[in-house]
Design a protein with these regions (language model features):
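Non-catalytic cap/lid and distal C-terminal segments of serine-dependent acyl enzymes
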Residues: 26-332
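N-terminal signal peptide c-region/cleavage motif recognized by signal peptidases
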Residues: 20-21
Length: 332
């Protein structure tokens, strides 16, 4: 092992131990509550500010991190977001909540809900962050990435809104979500078979889904049942196509495409999605960064992945801005 690899391994081991023992600087993670018109409810996000933020008048680039299915806005904090943001120094990290929505504007809603989750992120969260913090509120100062469902969201929202983000990414992304839905709607594949549950199994499932997670703390949005939209994400195959990153990346003019980052663990069942998307990019001469590392679909892998995400996407923003964005000036 080279000295560089030994150093990286030592940093990762130290971070994993810190995360496991809860000593990562959680005091740097702030929870913000705000009203989101797109989903007509009060929501929360976590934010990490640069150490010099209070003593500076400068504006900072922002990295948005999207969580996975059944998770929430606290997930990335547990993977070391504050630690890695601190290594970058001049970076704001925002971790919004998207419930179990797949980050799309739902075509059909039930129970009186409004589920415009794409708009929640790209309009309400980004708007609230830009309106309340000293951000670099333009494309060059924003990047977005997510894990699993959030990896799908990071690429899809970035490709549907290429004017908002200079870099987009996915780690362990479930990138075939919309493509599978479109294929089922067209009758090209059979709907996924679901095993029949016994009455006891169904009762147990409903009890688990109704259980409130006190760590979320969002009124009427803290159990899996509450966090799962009622309705249909896509009413037609065409509706699913509109949220398919495999199609979207071919519709954005090359000169308007954001930087694209992909990674996946080699033991992750979703690595095929990442490889298939990378193949589409390669065949169409779209520049991208792709990384495969040992690991599965789990927190240990994502803690390691986050270090690469922050380093690469921060550097893309820094270069797009033309200089190191913060001079660390202090107020008198």
């Amino acid at each position: 092992m080279t000295n560089a690899n030994m150093a990286r391994s030592s940093i990762l081991v130290a971070l994993l131990l810190a995360v496991a023992t809860g000593v990562v600087a959680q005091e740097k993670v702030h929870t913000v509550e705000f009203y989101s018109p797109a989903v007509e409810r009060t929501m929360k996000y976590n934010i990490v500010l640069p150490e010099a933020y209070e003593a500076s008048d400068e504006r900072y680039p922002v990295l948005y991190l999207l969580h996975g299915l059944t998770s929430n806005y606290t997930a990335w904090s547990r993977q070391g977001a504050a630690f890695y943001a601190g290594l970058a120094g001049d970076l704001i990290v925002v971790m919004p909540d998207g419930g179990n929505s797949w980050y799309v504007n739902w075509a059909e809603n039930e129970k009186g809900q409004r589920n415009d989750w794409e708009d929640h992120i790209v309009k309400d969260v980004v708007g609230h962050v830009d309106g309340n913090y000293r951000t670099i509120a333009r494309r060059e100062g924003r990047a977005i990435t997510g894990l699993s469902m959030g990896g799908y969201g990071g690429l899809t929202l970035g490709l549907r809104n290429p004017d908002l983000f200079v870099s987009i990414g996915s780690t362990s992304g479930a990138l075939s979500y919309a493509r599978r839905n479109a294929a089922e709607a067209r009758g090209e594949v059979a709907p996924r078979a679901r095993r029949e549950r016994t009455a006891e199994e169904q009762a147990g499932l409903e009890a688990r889904q109704a259980r409130i997670n006190p760590n979320i703390g969002i009124e009427s949005f803290s159990s899996q049942a509450e966090r799962t939209p009622a309705g249909r994400a896509f009413a037609t195959a065409e509706g699913a196509d509109a949220y398919d990153p495999f199609k979207l990346v071919l519709q954005v003019p090359h000169e308007d495409l954001p930087h694209i980052y992909l990674d996946s663990g080699t033991e992750d069942r979703l690595i095929g999605d990442a490889r298939a998307f990378a193949q589409v990019l390669f065949e169409n001469d779209v520049p991208f960064d792709f990384m495969q590392m040992p690991g599965g679909h789990n927190g240990t892998y994502w803690t390691q992945s986050l270090g690469h995400i922050v380093s690469i996407q921060y550097e893309v923003m820094r270069r797009a801005l033309g200089e190191r964005p913060v001079r660390r000036s202090r107020r008198p």
